[in-house]
Amino acid sequence: MARNSLRKGTLSSVKPSLEDLNDTSEEDYEVEDVMSEVESTDEANDESEEKTDLESTQRQLKSIPFSELLEAQRALKSEKVKFTQKNGAKLSKNRRRHESPSDSEDDDDDRNDRSKHAPVEMSSKRAVPRFREVVHVPKPLRRDPRFDTLSGNLNVDKVKNNYGFVMEYRLSEIKQLEQELKSCREQERRERIKEALKSLRSKLERRKEDERTARVLKEHRQSEKEKIRQGKKPFYLKKSEQKKLLQLDKYKSMEGTKALDRYMEKKQKRRAQKEKKRLPRARPDRA
């Protein structure tokens, strides 16, 4: 009937009969039974294979000596530790990346607290300039005229003549400070004036010493030049001999004055202090 209806072209009038439905249901049931039997046999085969594999592995493990098993266990432990360390390092890096600025500041404070006397840590990072340097511009070099050959050699006599007014200014300043010290009543102000006078007087003394050394050495050179003209060999002074000449000139300039006595007393005190330092220390008395 279905075939006749299809030939006629009327699909809406097609109605399956009971016989056709019974035939299809019986065929489906037979297919399902076959599939279930196949699956059950596959599962049974898998279970049997797993059992045989387990039995074979157990036999192999029984045949392995205990020392080899211990070595394998240690190797597994070491690999596990390495794996955890690598993962820990990766986690710490990720934490640093996703760390908030407040957390990083707290870490910096803790680090500073831990290392109190450590040197200051400075970042080596530098901002990239916006403009690229196409032409290299040489950096201007600063020049100190005191130590540069372009300024020429130092002529001490010329400098003294050119800057002689500085010495006169210092002498006038010393007189002014001495007068101010007499009239001043404040203790702090008096101390400051005394310090200023001390520094100025020491500068004057230093200037006089330099002039004396220059004069003594100049006289010695002139005398040696005269001896060379007479056909004698030149004699060059050592540092120790220069000091002796300067001391003799100093004694001659202070002869017949109280300044020589004061100078000798100071010198004796210095020598006594040096000798005292060289003496061995006294042992403590044992009770």
Swiss-Prot record:
The keyword Ribonucleoprotein applies. It is found in: Nucleus, Nucleolus. Residues 201-229, 256-266 have a biased composition (Basic and acidic residues). The keyword Coiled coil applies. GO terms for biological process: maturation of SSU-rRNA from tricistronic rRNA transcript (SSU-rRNA, 5.8S rRNA, LSU-rRNA). Residues 1-131, 201-236, 256-287 are annotated as: Disordered. Residues 30-63, 167-215 form a coiled coil. Associates with 90S and pre-40S pre-ribosomal particles. This is rRNA biogenesis protein rrp36. It comes from Schizosaccharomyces japonicus (strain yFS275 / FY16936).
